């Protein structure tokens, strides 16, 4: 696992994917065995009172959502179908283990740098209204789901 903590959205959010393209491409070049890339962050919704959660056991957990880029905007993105299939596989396992952990998958016309790797996706963890505790709780369940899915790939 490679955890990149670079702040690609500083100084301007509008160019964050241009900046992250260079960083992710460099990481993939330096780590040829990397097959899966997740862009994990909170959903930047202007309404900071919106905080999607689900109760798992006794915990309030931020709901997550896959955002999958495509070639719908005219940019080359040959592996978007593979990325979507992989997200569906993860989401199906999550629904089996922890119903409600994920909101429905969103398919977009932008690439979000997902053209760089098969199995690439955005995982939005809650929104700006969720607490850090709710988001960290989600990571615990996401790691269990990924562990089961990756054991079968």
Locations of regions flagged by a protein language model:
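Active-site-proximal beta-strand/loop segments in catalytic clefts of secreted hydrolases
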Residues: 4-7, 39-43, 68-71, 106-109, ...
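Extracytoplasmic/secreted envelope proteins and their assembly/folding machinery
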Residues: 18-25, 84-91, 120, 136-139, ...
């Amino acid at each position: 696992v490679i955890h990149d903590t670079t702040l690609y959205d500083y100084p301007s959010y509008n160019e964050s994917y241009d900046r992250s393209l260079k960083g992710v491409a460099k990481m993939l070049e330096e780590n040829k065995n990397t097959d899966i890339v997740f862009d994990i962050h909170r959903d930047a919704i202007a309404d900071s009172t919106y905080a999607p959660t689900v109760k798992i056991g006794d915990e309030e957990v931020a709901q997550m959502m896959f955002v999958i880029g495509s070639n719908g905007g005219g940019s080359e993105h040959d592996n978007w179908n593979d990325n979507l299939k992989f997200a569906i596989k993860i989401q199906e396992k999550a629904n089996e283990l922890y119903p409600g952990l994920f909101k429905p998958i969103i398919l977009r016309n932008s690439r979000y740098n997902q053209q760089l790797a098969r199995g690439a996706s955005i995982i939005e963890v809650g929104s700006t209204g969720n607490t850090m505790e709710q988001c960290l709780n989600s990571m615990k369940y996401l790691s269990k789901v990924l562990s089961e899915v990756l054991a079968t790939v």
